[in-house]
Amino acid sequence: MSKNNLNETESKIEIEAKVVELLSNDKFKVELPNKKTIIAYVSGKIRINNIRILPGDKVRIELSPYYPTQARITYRFK
């Protein structure tokens, strides 16, 4: 079994975004700085610590270069 030399965290793209709308199952519609909207889901640490995310909040998201229409919310700014 060979492992890929590229680390998963190095291939992720981190961007600040704004939450526009709440969707079901802890998913959110977020707006990127280029005014494009994508679907984002909550990371496990945010879910475990019961951090509430509301429309209008600024968040940090991780985008995968392989699936750029879906993101993961990793941090909510105060």
Curated annotation (Swiss-Prot):
Domain S1-like intervals: 2-78
Subcellular location: Cytoplasm
Gene3D superfamilies reported in the protein's UniProt record: Nucleic acid-binding proteins
Assigned GO CC terms: cytosol
Keyword Protein biosynthesis attached: yes
Keyword entries, A-Z: Cytoplasm, Initiation factor, Protein biosynthesis, RNA-binding, rRNA-binding
Record carries keyword Protein biosynthesis: yes
Main location: cytoplasm
Molecular function terms from GO: ribosome binding; rRNA binding; translation initiation factor activity
Pfam families documented for this protein: eIF-1a (PF01176)
InterPro entries linked to this entry: NA-bd_OB-fold, RNA-binding_domain_S1_IF1, TIF_IF1
Binding partners and assembly: Component of the 30S ribosomal translation pre-initiation complex which assembles on the 30S ribosome in the order IF-2 and IF-3, IF-1 and N-formylmethionyl-tRNA(fMet); mRNA recruitment can occur at any time during PIC assembly.
Function description: One of the essential components for the initiation of protein synthesis. Stabilizes the binding of IF-2 and IF-3 on the 30S subunit to which N-formylmethionyl-tRNA(fMet) subsequently binds. Helps modulate mRNA selection, yielding the 30S pre-initiation complex (PIC). Upon addition of the 50S ribosomal subunit IF-1, IF-2 and IF-3 are released leaving the mature 70S translation initiation complex.
Similarity-based family: Belongs to the IF-1 family.
Protein name, UniProt field: Translation initiation factor IF-1
Organism: Aster yellows witches'-broom phytoplasma (strain AYWB)
Gene that encodes it: infA
